[in-house]
């Protein structure tokens, strides 16, 4: 194995509901330009349960990043992908995991998902991961392991599903309310004027992701 492959820090990108791993293509390229090794984890967001997908992510980390590689591992998850990450972190995660960035993840609840789940035929469309998550007691707490830092990035541009699902609290990103993203125990959080899906193509988001992966904090000014 080459020396650079042993020392390179890895970022694993985890997509959200109804989307393939390819939706993180831009962020993948941007992170590679910063010197990271980038992997995109794909999973059945509709067919698989949250528990199954979290276990699959844990196995993916173990298989794709050999135990002999000591370099830090970072995770970035969009929406449901963030919930998969949080669920995986509850089960003795790899000690090399250092930082996590959650993009538009409904950490504590989801008004849109609960409203849709109550409509005929919608539970099957939302999928088993979302339904399992909704069945749990609301409220998620960040892992307590001291070496783990989690950053929460939320959007405030209300464009999307929220316009047809009544009652979504403001501010929101069109799908997830800002208040729903607030993860107790997170190292830092930031709100940007982007919509839910826009996070996947936003250079502003990319810059904040990179800053958090490097420092464990976002940059809270106008210079990003």
Question: What positions do the PLM features span?
Answer:
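Serine-dependent carboxylesterase/thioesterase catalytic core
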Residues: 9-22, 26, 30-147, 168, ...
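Short beta-strand-to-loop junctions in surface cap/lid or active-site-entrance loops
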Residues: 1-8
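C-terminal catalytic-base region of ester-bond hydrolases, centering on the histidine
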Residues: 147-224
């Amino acid at each position: 194995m080459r020396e650079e492959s042993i020392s390179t820090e890895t970022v694993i990108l985890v997509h959200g509901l109804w989307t393939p791993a390819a939706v993180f293509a831009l962020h993948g390229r941007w992170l590679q330009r910063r010197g990271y090794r980038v992997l995109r984890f794909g999973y059945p967001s509709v067919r698989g349960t949250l528990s199954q997908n979290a276990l699959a992510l844990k196995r993916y980390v173990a298989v794709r990043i050999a135990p002999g590689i000591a370099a830090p591992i970072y995770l970035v998850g969009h929406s449901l992908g963030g919930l998969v990450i949080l669920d995986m972190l509850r089960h003795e995660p790899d000690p090399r995991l250092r930082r996590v960035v959650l993009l538009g993840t409904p950490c504590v609840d989801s008004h849109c998902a609960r409203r849709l789940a109550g409509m005929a035929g919608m539970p099957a469309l939302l999928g088993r991961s979302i339904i399992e998550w909704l069945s749990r007691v609301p409220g998620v707490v960040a892992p307590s392991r001291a070496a783990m830092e989690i950053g929460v990035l939320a959007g405030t541009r209300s464009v999307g599903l929220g316009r047809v699902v009544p009652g979504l609290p403001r501010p929101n990103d069109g799908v997830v309310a800002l208040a729903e993203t607030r993860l107790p125990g997170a190292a830092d959080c930031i709100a940007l004027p982007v919509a839910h899906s826009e996070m996947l193509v936003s250079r502003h988001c990319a810059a904040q992701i990179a800053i958090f992966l490097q420092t464990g904090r976002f940059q809270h000014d106008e210079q990003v």
